[in-house]
Amino acid sequence: MTEIYIVRHCEAQGNLKRLFQGVSDFDITETGAKQLEYLKKRFENIHLDKIYASPLIRTRKTALAVAGGRDIEIKDEPGIIELNGGVVEGKPFKETFNSIPGLAETWDNHPEDFAPPQGEKMRDAYERIWNTVKRIAVENSGKTVALATHGGITRCLMCRLLNGDITKLASTPW
């Protein structure tokens, strides 16, 4: 049986500052560094054949913690990178979302229709992550792997697994 562990990155600077991080390359905070230690301990007795990481510093550091110094291949996987926020990238959630008509309401109540200007549509990210995870599962049949990824991507994946329908994204927990 193939096993896939899904790990959201530890706290990053953008989380602390309440920014839309998206594909911006924010580093881990001091709290995030402590979380990395807990994560290392949590995975120390779990056999992993490979770890896939979104190619951002916060997920790479998370993947290294999951590996815990063991000789486990860590592979950059762009298919599990966070949603590209376009014009909202790296900006404060509240102020930015409220400055673009309809964006905050869509994010809160109909996230499946979220499509920031110059960014990635949520529906595209939803399909991207699902296709990536299916490919990884096939490539690692019978193995155990971990994915170091992001909150939005994890939520999309959980929605797909639990509900099978992106229209249920608003009711899918983070």
PLM-predicted stretches and their roles:
Residues 69-130, 170:
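Phosphate-handling substructures
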Residues 3-9, 147:
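Short, hydrophobic/glycine-enriched beta-strand segments
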Residues 53-54, 127, 148-149:
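Short beta-strand scaffold positions
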Residues 7, 11-72:
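Active-site-proximal alpha-helix that buttresses catalytic centers in soluble enzyme cores
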